Amino acid sequence: MNVPHPTRRRALATLGGAAAIAAAPAFLRTVNAQGLVKLSYQCGWLAQAEQGGLYQALATGIYREHGLDVEIRPGGPQVNVMQLFLAGQSDFAEADSFRGFAFAQEKLPAVAVAAFFQKDPRVLMSHPGVGNDSLEALKGKPLLVATAGRQTYWLWLKTRFGFTDEQLRAYTFSLAPFLVDKQVSTQGFLTSEPFAARKAGVDPVIHVLADKGFDNYQNVVVTSPKMVREKPEIVQKFVTATAKGWASYLHADPAPANALIRAANPAMGEDLIAYAIGAMNKYGVVETADTQATMIGAMTHQRWKGFYDTMVAAGAQPAGTEIRNGYTLQFVGKPA
């Protein structure tokens, strides 16, 4: 059975040596004829529902209401997001907690300013009815895990659940090996792979890693320390407007954003977009107690430190990093 891998795939590339070519951010260079500040946001992947808040803020005029003219740039498998950002090619870019740790460790000119996915949508999927109804039950059983995941969440799974490397099987960016073997579980993303599995006739058991303590922030917005220092009001406007975009996308009519998403990425079907929106709402990917206390995009020192300590214990991060150098709570302490 040859089942194509669904559109969704997060692929933030390695930082490499991009810091050496860091340039002035674009915001210092451009204001349009209407007096709006021109900004760019570099996504980690092709246009999809997981960027819906950005596209909704653009499509419904929320950014313009905040004095911003925002360009959303899709990513993809050949796009090195961090290299582009550190070279000054975008004002904001998509990252995660691991990037924030790297910013601090490597003293890179980048800082996280908001986290629009409170839950990392990473999952493991299993077949129903074969005794694999919990993560604990997967110990000793075959798992399809990509190379990148073996350096992050796999180390955590080994520490948390006693998994071993003998369980690992190659992940080929296809669901076919999973679909043909009921004893195999596979990595995936909450917003796509379960949908694809159901389309192929399997209603999977979904193990959400975040629900078991994998507290990685995703859809983290990063910008330059220069932007934070010299134009904090612009950063605040972007964060606030994007938070409003997410609230609108999840709880009002998402059609304006969806039209832009499908125009930028025709492979995104309406049914997959609808599924992804439903999953984000059902599993609390964007909205949690932290966002209710402050705003969508919230971050806390406790969450950053707790996840860092967990990753140090798992051997996924070196000890001794001053992680607060990689993020700031300056822009996420106020209701949007």
Positions of predicted regions on the chain:
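Short, glycine-/small- and polar/acidic-enriched structural segments
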Residues: Q34-G188, H207
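Secretory targeting signals
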Residues: M1-P6
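Structured segments of extracytoplasmic/periplasmic soluble domains
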Residues: A57-T60, H66, L84, G88, ...
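Conserved C-terminal helix/tail region of periplasmic/extracytoplasmic solute-binding proteins
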Residues: H301-A336
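Pocket-lining segment of extracytoplasmic ligand-binding domains
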Residues: F98-R99, F173-A267
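Short, surface-exposed acidic
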Residues: F163-L168, N265-G278, Q317-N325
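Secondary-structure end/capping motifs
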Residues: R229-A314
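N-terminal export signals
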Residues: R10-T30
